Regions:
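NAD(P)-dependent dehydrogenase/reductase Rossmann-like domain
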Residues: 1-174
Length: 174
């Protein structure tokens, strides 16, 4: 209803629903076989790539969540202080990640920040890690490993940084 892209949150919810369908997935596994996946050659490098990919995806997830809060605050005239919200999460929420300190700092630098990805700290982190996200998502797709949140993070980044989205193609088909 807010008109904010929260595709990672939606993908995570969908993955949770799918995880509950064990019996159906077991039946499908016997019917819809995929080719064997070759083993990873360099486990240490692969683990580092996954760590970096997850970090980039986490930034996108928080960017989407805080964009949703920003939009709701503007739409409903709530005057939410997003930096304070991040600090509250850090102090007493189940999340309590050190990463929330970086979010608090971003909103302290710019209280009107529309998206975390526009903050220098976060766009530098994305620049340093987005290729790992792209490689990890591609590996998952190649091997048939479902990575809905990770692939949505990559799609979001690609759409967010592009002045022209696929909507132009949809409009051309009308």
């Amino acid at each position: 209803r807010q008109g904010v892209d929260v595709s990672m949150i939606t993908a995570a919810a969908g993955a949770r629903v799918m995880s509950n369908a064990l019996e159906t997935r077991e039946k499908a596994a016997g019917l819809l076989e995929v080719d064997a996946v070759p083993p990873v050659q360099d486990r240490k490098a692969f683990a580092e790539q996954i760590r970096r990919a997850l970090y980039a995806a986490k930034i996108v997830a928080y960017a989407q969540g805080f964009s949703l809060l920003r939009d709701a605050s503007e739409r409903y005239h709530w005057s939410l202080d997003l930096g304070t919200i991040a600090a509250i999460f850090r102090a007493g929420c189940i999340i309590q990640a050190d990463f929330l300190n970086d979010i608090t700092a971003a909103f302290r630098r710019d209280p009107l920040l529309g998206n975390l990805l526009l903050d220098r700290f976060f766009h530098e982190k994305i620049a340093a890690n987005h290729q790992s996200l792209r490689s990890a998502a591609a590996s998952g797709i190649r091997t048939g490993l479902p990575l809905p949140a990770m692939t949505n993070a990559l799609s979001y980044l690609d759409a967010f940084r592009s002045p022209h989205t696929g909507a132009n193609l949809i409009q051309a088909q009308r």
